[in-house]
Amino acid sequence: MTPMSAPETLSSLVDTRRVLVTAGAGGVGKTTTAAALGVAAAKRGKRVLCLTIDPAKRLAESLGIGEMRSEAATVDNARFEAVGIPMKGSLTAMMLDTKRTFDELVIKYSSTKEKADKLLSNKLYKYVSTSLAGTQEYMAMEKLVAVKDDPRYDLVILDTPP
């Protein structure tokens, strides 16, 4: 945006972007904004993935769904249509599982299944994959890279922690 140009509209953001990130201090409405962007985009016909890396798990509450897991779960469009929101697209939600994402990387880059299994069962690996400082942030970036090109989604919305 140049200093003299008008800001983008919500419609243009969800129509032209592949990834949107909500970021900021705690309590500013990141999760609510991520949920609203997801609903707005799905209403316009987009296939949306809302990925949260916030351990508070508020995205599930904002979307009116049960417990979030590391597997993508599509929100039933009937939920929205029941409250007068016609959905042309779909809204899927997923919560980052740091350990699982780390394990997926090991499997992806190991030359054999045996080598992957050996590393995955190693006590030091098990500790590092869950306790190393910065692991959650690194795995969040890895997961974002993995899903941003996923043909199942037109838009990925990343909900970040405070």
Model-predicted regions and their roles:
Residues 2-21, 28, 33-162:
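Flexible phosphate-sensing "switch/lid" loops adjacent to ATP/NTP-binding sites
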